[in-house]
C-alpha cells in the first residue's frame, strides 16, 4: 500500500503514532485521531479502496466523529468519585472517559450506559461488543432490554470482541 492509515483508538497513543510517521520512508502514513475502538471500527468500515487517500481520510474521520462510545468495566482498586466510594471489583459504566454508573450487575450497568448515550432521532445503530469476561447470554439480555425500550428506533448488533478488561464496548451511531 502506498498509503497506510493508523487508527490509534486511544487518545494516549495518538502523539506516539504521529511521531513515528517519519520512520516510514517508503510509504505515506496518516494517523487518524480515533480515540476509541468503536471509532476505529466505524472508520474502517467506510474505507473504500477505489477512493483517494484524501477522500478516505475525510470519510473515515467523519464516520469516527459520529460515534459515541461507552464501556463497562470494573474498578481495579478502591477509590472515590464525587464523594462516593468505589470498591475494587465494582462494575463501572463509562460514557467516553467519564464514570457515569456503578453497580454489581453487568447487564444493568450496560443498559444504563447505552440509555445515557442514545438519542432518538440522532442515533439509530448500537453495537454491543462483549468481552472475554462477558457472555453471549448477557449480550442477548442487554439487546432484549434495549429492544423493549427503543423498538424499531434502535438497530442492535452483537459482536464477540473477546477483549480483556471491558465486559462491553458500546458503540452508538
Go through each PLM region and give its residues.
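N-terminal loops that bind phosphate or other acidic moieties
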Residues: 1-173
